[in-house]
């Protein structure tokens, strides 16, 4: 009898531990979207929770790829654990220059593998009343050990960056998948 109880406790504990991470991720996304809604209405920086070292700044949507992502400020490991992040040295959407957004290849940016030239992204920012549409103009793979991602464009562009290859068994390689899109419309 004691063996059965012990096995049941181990089984329940294993299930609970396995469910904890996805539940935590769902709760985080809910809080991030709630913070975005407040920030988008007020223009103020709103943290999703008190100890978070970032705040939502951009909403990135693609109807074709069924994506509606809230982008956080900064692209540190702590930020990317919760969602896509805007590189703080890059421009805000709609301005001349590059808006650089990064995310993990196996979570928020896994859909980039299916993006093709001509696809469009809708972008909103807490720093602008305008919405923007960007159209994909280039897709390339670079080695980040040899080439830096250029963010000095003379026009308004969006770069979405993730690790490559998408199906890599080991994470942390130097290859990056870079999707570049140009501003085509303000709304």
How would you describe each model-predicted region?
Residues 4-187:
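Solvent-exposed, non-transmembrane regions of membrane-associated and secreted proteins
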């Amino acid at each position: 009898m004691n063996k059965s109880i012990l096995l049941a406790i181990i089984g329940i504990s294993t299930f609970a531990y396995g469910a904890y991470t996805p539940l935590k991720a769902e709760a985080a996304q809910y809080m991030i979207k709630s913070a975005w809604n407040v920030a988008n209405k007020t223009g103020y920086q709103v943290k999703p929770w008190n100890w978070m070292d970032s705040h939502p700044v951009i909403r990135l949507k693609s109807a074709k790829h069924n994506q509606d992502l809230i982008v956080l400020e900064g692209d540190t490991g702590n930020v990317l654990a919760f969602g896509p992040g805007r590189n703080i040295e890059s421009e805000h959407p709609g301005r001349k220059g590059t808006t650089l957004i990064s995310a993990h290849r196996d979570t928020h940016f896994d859909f980039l593998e299916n993006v093709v030239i001509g696809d469009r992204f809708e972008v909103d920012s807490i720093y602008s009343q305008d919405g923007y549409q960007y159209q994909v103009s280039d897709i390339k793979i670079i080695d980040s050990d040899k080439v830096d991602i250029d963010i000095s464009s003379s026009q308004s562009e969006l770069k979405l960056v993730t690790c490559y290859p998408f199906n890599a068994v080991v994470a942390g390689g130097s290859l990056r998948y870079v999707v570049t899109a140009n501003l085509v419309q303000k709304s």
